[in-house]
């Protein structure tokens, strides 16, 4: 058994592509760039026994003063624009645990779970320039990002796998997984006064711009069959893997908010509403055959 504690503090310069509003053909740089600061701490513990191997980790990480740039079409200004988001701050903390349980000589049960909180902790500043002549569209606008969840990472996960290792190199596995509390990646532009304030003239439309969409929970069921051939100093393994055995075709894999804005004209009025989130979906039932050779 052992316990390990680690901590880190670092600062790194922004990526070269994030220092320019449009690095392909425009030398205009982001105003007053600063290094991104990173602070992290982690506690790991491991317990090994004749039947059970258990390990757990507790972690916390914070990044401050991040910079992101993007080129997009601005529907409110009716022009292509270059955007810089500065002062991005994120916090991640949580716990992970995993256990391998040897049920018998040939059977192994593996369990794993994690729970965390990944969110934006600061309201960054958004500067938007026209891609045509660098004229200002919006300068140092406050984005209501504080409290939004970080997209792309489930905050609750669980996995169970049962494996059988048979004679003569045969074996099989079956696993079930769960991912919950997932959100689309939020876009800072939508939460500025120019977009959410002017476009969301009613409370309903304002909430549509600033509310973050939660993705449905996801479940997976996979299986694999493998056969190993041992030689004097090498091994050949053939595996047939089956993914998404249930054949669910509408499992959302991830998503992000759109930067586009819709114009709605009921009569003589003009209303604005955000476009729907862009989502990607997991593969349907799939089969993979792999062959590996180790020597």
For every predicted segment, state its role.
Residues 151-230, 254-255:
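C-terminal beta-barrel architecture of Gram-negative outer-membrane proteins
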Residues 2, 9-64, 74-103, 149-156, ...:
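Outer-membrane beta-barrel signature, preferentially recognizing the C-terminal barrel domain
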Residues 53, 58-62, 80-188, 292-294:
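Gram-negative outer-membrane beta-barrel transporters
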Residues 8-14, 21, 50-52, 61-65, ...:
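Structural signature of outer-membrane beta-barrel domains
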Residues 2, 45, 120, 164-171, ...:
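A general secondary-structure boundary signal
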Residues 11, 178-196, 227-295:
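C-terminal beta-signal and adjacent terminal beta-strands/loops
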Residues 1-3, 51-54, 106-109, 168-172, ...:
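Repeated loop/turn-to-beta-strand initiation elements of outer-membrane beta-barrel proteins
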Residues 17-29, 68-83, 122-146, 186-209, ...:
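Solvent-exposed loop segments that connect transmembrane elements
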